[in-house]
C-alpha cells in the first residue's frame, strides 16, 4: 500500500498546481501526471476538478465526505500517535526537561499508524474535488505525519507546497506579491488574512503550515532558515491570534535549542497564557522556572516553580516544584 501513495504525492501536487490557475504553470508547458499502476485505469475525482463549476449542493457533499471520512479520521490517528508517545515519556526533574513531553524518536516508530495517516490524507485529496474546504487540512496532516516520522525533506515539500498553492491571489488567479506593498498587500506581511465571524468556517491552513515549517527547520537545527520566517511572523499584523500561542512556542523552542535561556523562558511564559490549566501546563511552568534559573533570574524562577504546584496532577512534579522553589529562594 505504501508504494501506491508515495508516488501519488508528486501527482497530486502537480495536479493541484495545474488546476489552480495561470500563475501555476508556464504557457505551453504540459504537466504529466504519472499514476501508480492501481490508478492507471481510473479517473480520480481530483482530476475532474476543472470540469465545470462546483455548485453549492456538490460542495456540501464534497465537504461533508472529505471532512468526516478523511480529515477527521486522519486527525484522530495523528493525535493517537502523539498521545501514545506522551504516555511513554518520562521526565527527570533533576535535569533540564526536554522542550516537549514526547520525542520524535518515539513517534517515528509508530510508522504503521503514520503511514495510515498519509494514506487517509492522500486518498482524501485524490478522491475528491480539490475545491472542497478540507484539502489544505489534508495536505497539512500529510506533512505533519512525515515530520513525526522524521522524514523532514518530505515534510518540507508538503509545507512549502501549502505555502505556495494557498498564497494570496488576484481575482484572475495570479499571485499577489507577498512581503511587498504592491497589489494592496502590507509590505511587512507574509501571512494569510483569515476570515472572521460566525460563518467564517474552517480557517485556511497556510498559516499553520508556516508554523510547522519552522518546527521542521528547528528539528534539523536549521536555525538560520527558521529565524528568517520567525522574524517575519513576529512583526506580521496579519498573522492570526489563534496561532499566537504556537508562534510563541516555536520562538521559545528556537532559543531553547540555542541555549539562550532567558529569551527561551520569556517566550515560553508568553505561550503559557494560551494553555489550559492542565498537567502539561504545570510541566511547562516548571520548565520555565528551570530556564529562568539557568539565566540567573531566581525571582522569576521561583514564580514559575510556584505556579506549577497547584496546576500539577502529578505528585512527583508537585514535590519537585516545591523543592525547586525553596532552592532558588535560598539562593536569592
Residues covered by each model-derived region:
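Bacterial N-terminal signal peptides that target proteins for export
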Residues: 2-12
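Bacterial N-terminal signal peptides
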Residues: 10-20
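Acidic, polar-rich low-complexity tracts and alpha-helical solenoid repeat scaffolds
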Residues: 25-332
